[in-house]
Amino acid sequence: MYRRLGAHQRLVLEYKFFEPAFYATDVPDWGTSYAHCVALGDRAVVCLDTGHHAPGTNIEFIVMQLLRLGKLGAFDFNSRFYADDDLIVGAADPFQLFRILFEVVRGGGYGPDSDVTFMLDQCHNIEAKIPGQIRSVLNVQEMTARALLVDRAALTDAERAGDVLGANAVLMDAFYTDVRGDLADWRVARGLPADPMAAYRASGYAERIVAERIGGAQAGWGA
C-alpha cells in the first residue's frame, strides 16, 4: 500500500490499545505506530486519536515526542470519560485540550507550514449532530487561540529555574483568557459569521432537513 501512494499522498496510521482486534493486535500504542511509520518511510505518519488511551495517559507528552521525531501527522479529536466515548472534544477536560494544543504550537505543529491535520472523530448520539460538530470546532479554535497566548519566554525561564508555580501561572493566565471576542472579530474579517452556532440556528437548515428526511428522525446507532 505504501509503495502505491501517489505523489501528493501519505499514509496516516492510528493506534488503539483495545477493541477492535485489528487495533489492539496490530497497532496497540503510539510507539508501535511510530515504529511502523519509520520502517515505511517519510510519507508515513502517526494519527493520534485523543480517545485511544488508558485513563491518566499523558497525551501531551506523546504529542511532544511525535513532533520532536517528525512523525505526528494528524489528530482525531474527541473527549472520553470511560473508554473511546467519542464525545465532543474539550467537553470532558478542556484543560487537557489546551495542554495538547500548546504542545502542538510549541513543537511547530501549528501554522501554514505544518502538515499536522486536525480532524474530528466523534459520535453525537444525544445532541444534534451539526451543532455538535460546530461546538467541537469552536472548542478547538478557542483552545488553540489560548495556546497561542502563552508567554513562552516566561514559561521557559520558569522551567529552567525550577519554578513550578511560576510556570503554572504562565499557563493558567493564557488558559483563563476569554478569546471568544477576538475569534468573533477574526471570523467577521474573513466574511464569516461572528457566532457560527447562532448563524446555523437562524439559517433554518435544521428544520428544512428534518422536513425532507424520510421518517423525520436522524440516523443513529439504531438505523
Spans of features found by a protein language model:
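Histidine-acidic metal/acid-base catalytic patches
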Residues: Y2-R10, A24-A223
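Surface-exposed cleft-lining segments at the edges of enzyme active sites
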Residues: F17-A24
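Acidic/histidine-rich, metal-coordinating catalytic segments
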Residues: E14
